[in-house]
């Protein structure tokens, strides 16, 4: 008998099918140092947070990403990358911000969501039953439309930033997810 099926980007979930995290980008070559940079930057603490919101994404990877940058590029409380930045610069700029817009990528879950949590910042995502189930134990600001985000909304949800600072990073790992999923399947 099947106790549980755990699948990444399994939009049709429920019952025995449970969402699995996509996680951070895997090393794609010997020279790919993104994971090392992430590990280094996530422990650095000497950052000021002058920005409430960081917006940085490739607008060509999904239709829903188009036009989001235009919503925030003229706000002094938002940091918007008009063009692609290096991964190291991306992490530095993320550390300068409290929240980050995380639109879906090629699939509904993407690396960005997890990078933001590893950096102890708050992802801002569009409400979706799959994502809400997957991220139910993490500080996420849920919106129906990115256009509804204002500085006041972010200020009113500052408690999520405090929660993000207290994330136990081990709980974002694949072994933790595996152990939790197996435990739930056996003892639920």
PLM regions with names:
Residues 146-147:
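Short helix-start
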Residues 1-111, 118-141, 153-188:
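Nucleotide-sugar donor-binding catalytic core of glycosyltransferases
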């Amino acid at each position: 008998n099947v106790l549980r099926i755990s699948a990444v980007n399994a939009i049709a979930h429920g019952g025995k099918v449970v969402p699995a995290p996509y996680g951070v980008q895997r090393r794609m070559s010997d020279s790919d140092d993104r994971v090392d940079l992430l590990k280094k930057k996530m422990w650095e603490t000497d950052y000021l947070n002058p920005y409430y919101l960081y917006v940085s994404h490739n607008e060509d990877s999904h239709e829903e990403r188009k036009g989001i940058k235009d919503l925030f590029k003229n706000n002094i409380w938002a940091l918007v990358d008009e063009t692609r930045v290096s991964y190291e610069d991306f992490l530095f700029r993320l550390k300068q911000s409290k929240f980050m817009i995380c639109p879906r990528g090629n699939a509904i879950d993407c690396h960005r969501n997890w990078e933001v949590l590893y950096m102890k910042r708050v992802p801002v995502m569009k409400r979706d039953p799959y994502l809400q189930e997957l991220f139910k134990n993490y500080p996420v600001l849920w919106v129906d439309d990115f256009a509804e985000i204002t500085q006041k909304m972010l200020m009113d949800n500052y408690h999520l930033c405090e929660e993000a600072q207290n994330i136990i990073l081990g709980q974002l790992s694949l072994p933790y997810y595996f152990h939790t999923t197996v435990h739930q399947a056996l003892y639920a």
